[in-house]
Amino acid sequence: MNATTPRLRLVLLITHMDQGGAQEALLRLGRSLRSRGHDVETWFLYEKSPLYRNEDNIRVLLPVRSPGAVGYLQLMVRLFRQLRAHRPDAVISFLPLANGFGQAVARLAGVPRRVASQRNPSWTYTPWMQRLDRLAGTLGCYTANVGNSQSVVDSFAAYPQPYRRHLTVVHNGIDWRSSELDPAAARARFGLPAGGPLILNIGRLAEQKNQSLLLRVLPSLSAGHLVLAGDGNDRGKLERLAADLGVTSRVIFLGEVARAAIPDLLRAADIFAMPTLFEGQSNAVLEAMHAGLAIVSSDIPAQVETLGGSGEDAVGDLLPLDDDGAWTRSLEALVRDPALRALMAERARARAQLFTVDRMTDGFERLVDISAPEGRVFSPQAGLRQRS
């Protein structure tokens, strides 16, 4: 705990319990804040899966997979009553429903600090979520509004000034634990080929993650296997595409991998490839950086921000989404050249030190500090700055 920050009672609020980067980031933040002496509970509005039931200090307000109209009314009443009873100093919320809906209820319940966190660009929200978030932020339900990257903050540029004045950036942070396995043992753990380069992608099998691009370029690569870790609605489509391209024998669909096993999976790989269409800030890329992998990524703004610009300044290859040839050339160079992979891995590992859980926690801790003036917000680039 910062020497000037009093011990706080905090509620971390998120829309639903399910596998996802936002959920992992919120739980990571909770553990870090708790280690600094704060009283922290994590509340899920509802439960799509029971994934985190065994975590400490968890509440589920409505144990259903998807609340209907009556369910949302129940959520409003339960959240209001539990906030009034718990009397937190601050609520930190992740994801649009927890932001707009949850922080409006928190304001009604008299919570003094209400920090919303935007995890993706505004244009990715559904229309009614956009309206809810815009209204809540404009009417003062957020005392601070955090984007996990500057590109996310920039996506709100057309919002009203009363909304924008609360925006700031706190990047994601990873509490990294290196694998204790050597690469051969790591490959054996997951049943992966013992020889040849492994190209790894971690993420939901969904349109956003764009794994089809990797399948399209795989036939042109002289060696290597593609490992897809994750599951989702696009799995069947991707399996059919692999068959159509004649690369089924070179693609491994691992399915969901437990979070605790991710360091071992990254140790097994040589190259991390992520042709994602959009991100807020990718935890998967941060983990690959901490693990020291050569990284090839789409050149979307969030990835450019994380990987350090473009050209010689970048710690990974940043490539356009509409140029399969560029992806083929980049991956082929890495497949053929272990020394190039090692150089890129070293640079990625060095830049990863900018994205630690301590830095992320510092940012949120300043925003919920009830001893600080409410008109000041935290930016990791500029320290504390007065809102305009």
Give the location of each predicted region.
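N-terminal strand-loop element at the rim of the active site
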Residues: R7, L12-Q74, N233
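Aromatic "clamp/platform" in nucleotide-sugar-dependent glycosyltransferases that forms part
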Residues: L277
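Short hydrophobic beta-strand element within catalytic cores of glycosyltransferases
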Residues: F44, A294-S297, V304-L307
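A short helix/loop element that forms part of the nucleotide-sugar donor recognition site in Leloir-type
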Residues: S179-L192, V377-A382
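Conserved acidic donor-binding segment of nucleotide-sugar-dependent glycosyltransferases
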Residues: G308-G325, A333-P338
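Short alpha-helical donor nucleotide-sugar binding micro-motif in glycosyltransferases
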Residues: L83, E256-V257, D264-A269
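Short His-centered aromatic/hydrophobic patch
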Residues: S93-N99, Q118
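A conserved mid-protein helix/loop that constitutes part of the nucleotide-sugar donor-binding site
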Residues: G20-R31, P197-S220, G224, N233-E239
